[in-house]
A protein has these predicted regions:
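Class I SAM-dependent transferase core
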Residues: 1-38, 68-85
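Active-site phosphate/pyrophosphate- and oxyanion-stabilizing loops and adjacent acidic/basic residues
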Residues: 26, 49, 128
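A generic alpha-to-beta junction signature in SAM-dependent methyltransferases
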Residues: 32, 54, 132-136
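Surface-exposed loop/turn positions
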Residues: 35-36, 58, 138
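Conserved beta-strand/loop positions that form the S-adenosyl-L-methionine
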Residues: 40-42
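Conserved SAM-binding loop of SAM-dependent methyltransferases across substrates and taxa
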Residues: 44-57
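Conserved SAM-binding motif I beta-strand of class I
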Residues: 59-64
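S-adenosylmethionine
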Residues: 65-186
Length: 186
């Protein structure tokens, strides 16, 4: 019902959703540090809601600035009785946090500024946005495609420009020929 009216999830194909979005999200579990998580641009709550089932004792904030995803997330939280998630409707540039989360998560993050940027420029934009708004202590995790490979040849150059360390981990998936990656920036 929600998808038909609001296009909350990127696909109508349930199998594709399970094989890609669900699998990608669960692949992050072994990489994320213990502690509070912030899912920026969460949309349908992917990966934040999915991770909340496997980390019931950890606080997960789902951030989105759009009304439809927020209403959907509030409905899901109520129906599934998820006590460990907090839903915040705001833009990351306007968010005020008293304590930096252990990790910040992005999946398919996009806005009018970012959509026109190269992958490297998008990455720099995201890192600067997080560092400026949340402080330098949070690790940043991005679920991405093969565009992450462009960073491998020049990782030291990118690390210097981002003022941090980049770790690229391939997600081993039995479902697709294309590759997915977890980018960790510390």
């Amino acid at each position: 019902k929600w998808h038909e009216q609001n296009n909350i999830i990127s696909t109508r194909d349930r199998t594709y959703f399970l094989q890609r979005d669900f699998f990608d999200s669960l692949s992050m579990l072994g990489h994320l540090p213990k502690g509070a998580l912030l899912d920026i641009g969460t949309g349908a709550g992917i990966p934040g809601i999915l991770l909340s089932f496997f980390r019931p004792d950890e606080h997960i904030t789902l951030l989105d600035r759009r009304d439809n995803p927020i209403r959907f997330l509030e409905h899901v939280k109520l129906i599934l009785k998820l006590e460990n998630i907090e839903i915040v409707k705001t833009d990351i540039n306007k968010m005020i946090m008293t304590k930096s989360p252990a990790a910040v998560i992005f999946k398919n993050f996009s806005n009018k500024v970012v959509s026109k940027l190269s992958f490297e420029a998008k990455l720099a934009y995201i890192v600067n946005m997080v560092r400026n708004n949340l402080g330098a202590t949070s690790k940043i995790f991005l679920l991405t495609g093969s565009n992450a490979l462009a960073l491998q040849d020049n990782t030291s150059k990118h690390c210097d420009s981002l003022n941090g360390k980049i770790v690229i981990t391939k997600i081993e998936t039995p479902y697709f020929d294309t590759n997915r990656y977890i980018l960790e920036i510390t």
